[in-house]
Structure formats: C-alpha cells, structure tokens
Amino acid sequence: MLGRLAVRQAVRCSKASIKPVNTHQLCLRNFSAIRRLSFVAGAQCRPYHTTANMLHRTARGEHGMAACGNPSAAVKFERLPTFAEPTHYNVRLSPCLNQFSFDGHATIDVTIKEATDVLKVHAQSLLIQSVSLITQPGDASKSLETSYDDKLNILTIKLPTTMQPQKVQLDFKFVGELNDKMRGFYRSQYKDKNGTEKFLASTQFESTYARYAFPCFDEPIYKATFDVTLEVENHLTALSNMNVISETPTADGKRKAVTFATSPKMSSYLVAFAVGELEYISAQTKSGVEMRVYTVPGKKEQGQYSLDLSVKCIDWYNEWFDIKYPLPKCDLIAIPDFSMGAMENWGLVTYREIALLVDPGVTSTRQKSRVALVVAHELAHLWFGNLVTMKWWTDLWLKEGFASFMEYMFVGANCPEFKIWLHFLNDELASGMGLDALRNSHPIEVEIDNPNELDEIYDSITYAKSNSVNRMLCYYLSEPVFQKGLRLYLKRFQYSNAVTQDLWTALSEASGQNVNELMSGWTQQMGFPVLKVSQRQDGNNRILTVEQRRFISDGGEDPKNSQWQVPITVAVGSSPSDVKARFLLKEKQQEFTIEGVAPGEWVKLNSGTTGFYRVEYSDEMLTAMLPDIASRRMPVLDRFGLINDLSALLNTGRVSIAQFVQVAASSAKEDEYVVWGAIDEGMSKLLACAREMSEDTLKSAKQLVVKMFEQTGAELGFAEQAGEDSQKMMLRSLVQARLARAGHQPTIDKFTQMFNDFLEKGTPIHPDIRLATFGVVARYGGKEGFDKLMNLRETTTFQEIERQTMVAMSQTPEESLLAQLFEYGFEKNKVRPQDQLYLFLGTGATHMGQQYAWKYFCEHIKEFLDKYGGANSSLFQRCLKFAGESFGNEKRAVEFQDFFCNCNVLSDTDRQTLARPIGQTVEAIRLNARLLESNRQIIENLLKQSNV
C-alpha cells in the first residue's frame, strides 16, 4: 500500500462552485516545499513488525542475520505534539473520476492547550494552495506560512504570534489525486455489462492514509466530529459515514453538493467516502438502523446474504454488548479494487467484492463462511475500534483481536451450519501458533516506533493469536464473566481511547481476579509455551509433572527464558468430553494431582483445545490415547489438537515423521474435515522433504500418501450425498485433491472428466470441489488444460472463480505456461493488484515453480514496489514471502537474505521496513531444511517399511 512513487500534479476540474485560489496568498519561499506534497510519498503503512535494526539481531528478534544497510539512515519518527488537538472538521471534496483528481477545502477547529507559535498536521500527496487562521468567529482569516517534512508527512504551520490556550480554526484549500494505490482517496476500475471501463472513488484511511485526502491530525488518539460534503456529478451516488441531510445543485447545474450529518467523535482513520454509479438493496434492524449493501451495477442481488446477516449481526451485538449502535445507518459497499479484506469505517464499511458478495449457486461453503466472518468482524469493530479506540497502534490488538473473536462468537451462534469453531482451530489457533513459533515473531503489544512499521503487524499475531488468547481467557473466566468485563470496558471508554491495561482492569473488576497478572505475559512477550508432561500413578490418583518452556520451531533454546501463567484443562479416557480438572501453571515446573483416574486410563491436557499452548506427551501417554483417536471416541477438538501439536513438533525434532505417520495411520476411520486437515498438513511436510531428496523418494512418498488416503477417498466419492453437512463436501475435496496430487490416476481421471463435462455439457461442478478440480487440470492437463482455465478466467464475472483459476494455473509444471501466466497477470495487468499475490500461491508445488517465482520476483522487484506502493505495503510483503518461503535448503536461505542486502533498488529505510518479513521467510526456509536433515534417514526407513 504506500508509495514512494512520484504522484503527478492533480489536474483540476472546471467547476463553477469551486472558487479559484489566489496564489498570491501563498508565501513564495514555502511554495516549493508545500508543492512537494504532490510529488513525494513518505513512510506509510497497512495491513497485516517494528523497527528491527535492519537485518541485524535485535532486542525484539533473536534470529541472527547478516548485517546490511545503514541503520543510522533510518528516519527518526516524530508524533504530533500534544499541545493542540482537533475537535471538529468540515471537509468538502470535489472529485473528478475521469481526471483522477479532487479539489478540497477543509477547516479544522483546534483547541490549543499550551502556548505555541506553531501548529502541526499531517498531509501527504496533496498540493496545498492556502492555509489560513481564524481566531474568532466572523474575524478575517490570516494567511499563514508553512513548511513541510516529506519524511514525516508533517505540515508545520507558523502562527502569526505565540498563542495562549484558546480555540482557533485552520482553513486549508488543496488539490489531491485519486490514486491507483488503494490508499487514501483512490480510484477503482471496473467494466459495466457492455464492457465499458468505469471508475468509482473510495477510501482506505487505516492506518495513516486520511492525510492523502485532507490535512488532519492523523493519529488514532485525536478524535473529533466530522461534517462532510461531496460535490459530484448528478448521476453519481455519494456516500460517507453519516446519512445525507441535503443535496443541492451547483451553479452550473452539472453537479450536486451532497452534505452528510455530523458524525460522532471518531479517529481520522475511520472517515470514509465513496462516489460512483452504485445500486443497493436495503433492510432495517429491530432498532431502526437502515442497512444497505451497495455494489456496482448488476451485482446488488449478490449482496442479499450479507444484508440479511448484517441486520441480524447489528441486533445481536446490540444485545451482547448492551450498547446500541449509535448511527442511523450502516452501509456495506463492495469495492472492485481493495487492498484489505474489508475496512470498518463507521457507517460506511468497505469490502472487497469477494468478501461481501455471495452467489448461492456458485459460492463455495468455505467462501460463504468467510463472508459471514468478515461481515461479522467489521461490524464488531463498530464497538471495538470505533466506539472505543486504541490510543496508539501498539494496542492495535484491542480492536483486531476482539473483532476477530466476536466474529466467531456471532457466526457460531447464528450460522451453525458452518461449524465455525471447528475451523477456528486451524484458521486462527494453528495460524497464530505457526507465526508465533518463529524467532522473528513479535508480541501482541508490539512497540510501534514509526507508522512505517504498521503493515507488518497486521498479521497472524495481531489477528489470530489475539483472537485465540481471547478465547482462552473467555473459557478461563467463563463467558458471562468475560462478557460482563467487556461491557464495562466499552461503556467506560466509549467515544474515547484506551490501552491494554484498561481492558485488564475492567475484566479484573468483573471477575474478581488479577487478570493483568494472568494475561500480561501473553500479550507483552512473544511466543507461547509447550508443556512437557509426564505422569505416575498413585492409587486412584494420577500425578502429572508439567514443565513449560517457550515453543520455538527450530527446537532451540529461548534466550529470554520466557514464562507464562497457563490455564490448564484436563480430560480423561473415562469421560473424554468433560473437563476432569483445571489448574493454573504459574511456575516453570509443577506437579498436579488428578483424583479418580484408573491405571491405564489416558489423560489429555488442553481439553477442547482452548489454550494457546502445545503439549508434548511421554510415549506412554500418547500410546494410551491412540485407540480412542482411532475410534473417534476422543472429541474432535481434542483429536485435532493432538495431531496438530505432533505436526508442529516435527520441526523441533522432538517428534519424527515416522511417529507422526503412526498417529495419522491410526486415524484411518476419521470423518472430520478439520482433523484430516491436520493430517494433510503433516503429510505435506513428508512430501516436501521427499521432493528435496530424490524423484524416487518423492514417488514412494506419494504412494504412501495414496495408501493412507485411498480408502477414505473411495468411501467419500465425488458426489454430494443427501443429508450430509457442509463439512463432508469440504472433506471430500481435501481428500480427493490430495490423492490427485499424489498421482492417483483414477482420481485424476475423474476430476478431468468432471471438468470436461462442465465445459462441454454444462454439468455444474460443486463449488466445494471446484478448486481441487481446477488444480488437477492445471497440473496434469498440459497446455490444453491451461488454456481452458485461462479462457474460464477471462469469461467469468465471479471473483471466487477468477481467484481459483489463478491459484490452479500457478501449479502448472511447465515453465512456459507459468511464464505466460505471470506475463498475463503482472505485465499485462490482467489481474487486479490486490489479487496478484495468488499467482505466487501455487508455485511451490514444483521445483520449477519455486525457482521461477523467486527469479521473477528478483527481476521485477522495482515494478512490484511501484505497483504496490512501496516496501511497507502488505501486498508487497506477502509476495516477498510467497516467493521464497517454500524453499528447503540453506543455500536458498542465504541467497534470499543476500538478495535483499545487495538489492540496489531498496533504500536503507526499505530494508529496515522489511527486516522482519525477510527474517521470517529466511527462518521458514531454514526450518524446512532442518526438517529434512533430521528426518532424511527416518523417511528412507519409513518408506522401505511401508513397502511403497
């Protein structure tokens, strides 16, 4: 997202209602400095690490890396001074969609709290035409001199004299660009039903992009009310956070001025506008809130599912939080070009089309459940984030972690068909653990020294780990107590700002426990524990010895000797679905006694997999559980947790691939999608190692996979059966896809037949097995299959199918076809920038694909930086990771690291920004290499013993 590209000077629209600016009002010696605002782009951010001192070992990262760059060249960050704060904005913008520009006029009511002779605001990529000051209503404005820091995006305004505490008003006139970088006030492009190219304008202001649209105090602590007027062409729809209160024609009659009601107090990153040819469907909540879903023409019917869900969601949150949604309306709008999944602007929530729109006959179950989660996530932000906002980005998790948790609470309670808490285990818990097990992770409460670092923390720590820790705390305190604490927190800090300690205080008051003491270790230090457990029998009691240490994927030592307070739940074989005992582990090692456990009865920690920790069992304890895993008597949440822990322990060397395969083989009768997903992940590690060893080894490993998956695949078949739930079709897709990738010819033939019947006879492919079908065609269909997929992508109008064809085609084993795909997507720009990272997604399927993707990234890094807006763009950082993380040897790790050290396209600030993403990718490559070296002989022996 972010840009260091030159932004061309905006071309102004000719509009009678915008008065020409008297440029003689400008101080000439400051004009060039101000004008640079339209040509430079400084340090910015947004979603998904902090200053990591280039690629050195740092206090916040432990993974040693070769030094490169010049740390002293990093820009020293400076926040706005606290001697002044805004109370109200009046913003009037006049966008010209076809000229990609807008004129602006903004006033800011400012309270000066301490004597000062300057005021400072943020502005970026704006041509500031005049700045003036009004000290008393009715007084003449005074033109002011300014200077601009293009590194900090701070406009310093020199006051006519030292001013004592008082209220003043700043007045700005400016011109800006409707950019194509999906940040600030930007343009989005689409084609109508006749193939005509159209544009709409939308916004993305989180984290620091409101300054692209108007001068402002662009930090979350500065809350103010907003009046917004948008001057647009008569045939266009204009939207903002609040409801429309007037529409008046301009003097020439060609445009209209749309004025919106005054907003509640909110941070600048939550302001939003949208302008374009839009249509909508609407409904009302029980409390009378007008809900609308807006789309480009021809797609509004696809918004019905989200509209119905959003109505239910607002009503449910009103009750759960015991605070009514305070605005009269809430619009949800699908934007064709959108870098995030969605953005929670108060009253005008923006989404990618794929994250909001559902076609009942085309959307897969998995995607439909994701839409439900995203809709619920953004609407939860209306309380967590909008009503109560973090003071600074260090506490970003206060909004993202709780919105992530509440989305599951809502969908779990209102959409039981998705069995969403099962998917939570892999999508949230395992995802958060996967990143947090790296030495190059970061704490949930991560120090943000510079907003340039923000992009890298919109990641699985801020979202998935925070979400999982909230779930653990909710189970520990109980949902009613947890809810009571959250209500207290929201009511206490509504329309204001908070820090993590404020939340712990509210939860402590609600529970009567010291929640800060319990939870600070989980949010202030990176990583999480693995509990090593052993046992002994004492009559009818079981004595457990539990030792905690930080779980690190490379199996090495924790230099910080981290320690947590760990809520432990225990289940036993005689009553596997119940919690037999609860303990709180406070020391490095403790003994716990469980009464009434018969000799030979299994004992499992982390009952229900509610805790954010892994468990390493003695061989005796693990063996005792195998029969109940095989019979599925052990609950599904626990089966997943056990197998997922074993899969993660593979990398540490504490579990071998042979041990994992033994447990996986005991699950031959497994019937749950999420458990098979954990098995599939572990077998993927076996296949990745085998691929690095030799073609013969890979062939034998694939035969072992077929042996494990074949029976289940035969039982499932390919067709949906009457009465089965949504999870069964997803399981069918997972198992059959794995068989096909392992070279099982009958499965490949069946997928191929299904695809041909779809093209030739119009026989529909079930949405839940469509991606697997496309993947088989790309892998085994040669150029003919590739061309068919390309034609399908060119002719479809549905984004999920567009994305699935891209992911599938990137798996081709033919370099010429992969080159064609990359040229199509990147060089011809046939794929939207927000979706281009999917072109990397399947390349790790082959050695050729790995090497091609990495080489392509290296050769085109400048284009990627320009296209995505700089090194701190989340899109750029994710492409960087996808291009390298599937490698599996030390040579590649060094090559990857050295490239970024020596790349002359990158500045020292870029390297500083990329330190953690690069470190995480290098660490992932080395983990792959370590897994291979520790299991090479074990794999050879395993394959021989398996007679494959």
UniProtKB/Swiss-Prot annotation:
GO terms for biological process: anterior/posterior axis specification, embryo; embryo development ending in birth or egg hatching; exit from meiosis; first cell cycle pseudocleavage; maintenance of centrosome location; oogenesis; peptide catabolic process; positive regulation of oocyte maturation. The active site is at 378 (proton acceptor). Keywords: Aminopeptidase, Chromosome, Cytoplasm, Cytoskeleton, Differentiation, Hydrolase, Meiosis, Metal-binding, Metalloprotease, Oogenesis, Protease, Zinc. Inhibited by chelating agent 1,10-phenanthroline, aminopeptidase inhibitors actinonin, amastatin, and leuhistin, and to a lesser extent by puromycin. One of its GO terms (molecular function) is metalloaminopeptidase activity. Its EC number is 3.4.11.14. Pfam families: ERAP1_C, Peptidase_M1, Peptidase_M1_N. The keyword Chaperone does not apply. Binds 1 zinc ion per subunit. Can also use Ni(2+) and Co(2+). Zn(2+) binds at residues 377, 381, 400. It is found in: Cytoplasm; Cytoplasm, Cell cortex; Chromosome; Cytoplasm, Cytoskeleton, Spindle pole. Belongs to the peptidase M1 family. Aminopeptidase. Required for the exit from meiosis, probably upstream of cyclin cyb-3. Involved in the establishment of the anterior-posterior polarity at the embryonic 1-cell stage by regulating the dynamics of sperm-donated centrosomes. Plays a role in oocyte maturation. Required for embryonic development. This is Puromycin-sensitive aminopeptidase. It comes from Caenorhabditis elegans.
